[in-house]
Amino acid sequence: MCGFLRVHDPHWLDEAYSDAIAAADTGLVMRNISIACKVATVLYWAMKERGEGRYLDAAGGYGMLTRLMRDLGFNFYWKDKYCDNLLVPGFAYNDSLGACRSVTAIEVLEHVTDPVGFVKETLDEAGAQTIIFTTELYEGEPPRPEAWWYYAFPTGQHIGFYQRRTLVALGARLGLTLSSANGLHILSKSPVNDHLLKFLTNRWMSRLGPWWIRRRLGSKTMSDHELMLKRIV
């Protein structure tokens, strides 16, 4: 048993996704800010990114994480089959851009019916060998319905729930190794040491590190602004 807890027949998904982003997701903004800071420290110090790499935020919602990562100096692109690109027009990913070094998928795996298929398809489409993602994990027996907010029953959108061993098994199916710390999970052919990941994503590193990184890489905020103005005229 791998600890994967899922809904057998989520027949209500069309109704649940009449709005791609649930109105009850009041943590969306703060979550994206926090995740952007953690991902930045991991890419810069653990994966040695120095501004040359290309990255994809899969199932990127309105484009908030992509915008934040570009503001920090990373060459991020957006893709989402179900949501409008409101915040990074002009930076949607397509095959002509070439392969990506890594893919992010923030709060996505709990929404999919086939996580192995999703991870494989996402990595194949981006030409990447690393996926960085978040999803809340549970330990031991499945939590009682009234004891775990992450079920989010009223929204109907969360249909799959994981333990650490679930993610290990998922990665093994695809030849990937799991690294996990402080709510950030990485499946990769070149795994990050868990102790390093824990250090890079701790409270102080994820607060102070991104501002150093932004100075070193150079923010894309204004260059993107100028590019958008040129496209308007």
Per-region residue spans from a language model:
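A short His-aromatic
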Residues: 107, 111
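Short "lid" loop at the C-terminus of a central beta-strand within the Rossmann-like core
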Residues: 137-141
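Residues that recognize and position ribonucleotide moieties
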Residues: 160
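Conserved N-terminal segment of class I S-adenosyl-L-methionine
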Residues: 1-102, 106, 116-125, 134, ...
